[in-house]
């Protein structure tokens, strides 16, 4: 079986096609697939190490994380130094810095997506955010409890108009997906405001 032969004999993710084509009877597509699989496994391991030393802090950059990764036994004792050319200057086509930059872009994009998911999932933000956009002239009221001493009519619209952006953020502040952007509070608030503006009128 050609695929099994590749698994058993080709373990260098940067092996040249010329050195391996005799193993797969010239089937380049099969070889390329195997190479991508090997590189993917290495990158998955690197991602775990980057995440381990980043400790969920988006503001922690490569100047802090990369030295910690290079000193980590899990890195030193693996095939990763060879993969990124730290211990073997061969035909590698990447560096630890390049792999970190790609992962860093991914984690920021992922955190941003999760932030939006958090906003969509929050019933308080959704309900009051939509209500704030409703025409103030609409008579959308609910009757107060019969036992209320004032016996007044409580306007949902009036209540909604009193909620500012800080009130919305106070509900979100304990969510990990919100806290991860603590280093950019103004940008975070802008995202919340933009989301509220994007809501449709109920």
Give residue spans per PLM region.
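Structural signature for extended repeat/solenoid scaffolds and their inter-repeat hinge/linker regions
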Residues: 1-202
